[in-house]
Amino acid sequence: MSVFVYPGSFDPVTNGHMDIIQRAAKLCDKLVVAVLVNSSKNPVFTLEERVDLLKCAVKGIDNVEIESFSGLLIDFMRKKNSKVIIKGLRAVSDFEYELQMALLNKNLDSDIETLFMMTNINYSFLSSSSVRELARHNGNIDGLVPDCIKDKIMDKFRR
């Protein structure tokens, strides 16, 4: 069984992420969307909230599972018996960072492959930080995030 892992902070999940999830899920038997605890970031949404938002967003995609992890991605990959990392790219600037990470992961485990997927051009401008900024100022996030989580995101910033 082929298991791919799509890691990220997903703070929050956007339609750009969903584009990658939907397309990557067609390439494997199981796609694990891995919500990471990143000590270098201060997420707005808690780990539990990010997992819950993703679970809502992927309802109906049968071969997608949502999990969280901390530590090295390579260790999580081994635990999941996965050899493929999925990374979404919006622009060349994303590629530079992700290439470094892919090479580092390859150095740690030569059996690991990183599959880069370009996001749909309709989402090439979209980031979690832009969604947070819009929501923080009561801006319109319609079409930027899955409908089932839009109100939860806006509610987070109304507090």
Swiss-Prot record:
InterPro entries: Cyt_trans-like, PPAT, Rossmann-like_a/b/a_fold. NCBIfam families: coaD_prev_kdtB (TIGR01510), cyt_tran_rel (TIGR00125). Substrate binds at residues 9, 41, 73, 87. ATP binds at residues 9-10, 17, 88-90, 98, 123-129. Keywords: ATP-binding, Coenzyme A biosynthesis, Cytoplasm, Magnesium, Nucleotide-binding, Nucleotidyltransferase, Transferase. It catalyses: (R)-4'-phosphopantetheine + ATP + H(+) = 3'-dephospho-CoA + diphosphate. The record marks 17 as: Transition state stabilizer. One of its GO terms (biological process) is coenzyme A biosynthetic process. It is an enzyme of class 2 (transferase). Reversibly transfers an adenylyl group from ATP to 4'-phosphopantetheine, yielding dephospho-CoA (dPCoA) and pyrophosphate. SUPFAM superfamilies: Nucleotidylyl transferase. Pathway: Cofactor biosynthesis; coenzyme A biosynthesis; CoA from (R)-pantothenate: step 4/5. GO terms for molecular function: ATP binding; pantetheine-phosphate adenylyltransferase activity. HAMAP family: PPAT_bact. Belongs to the bacterial CoaD family. This is Phosphopantetheine adenylyltransferase. Homohexamer. Its EC number is 2.7.7.3. GO terms for cellular component: cytoplasm. It comes from the Bacteria. It is found in: Cytoplasm. Its cofactor is Mg(2+).
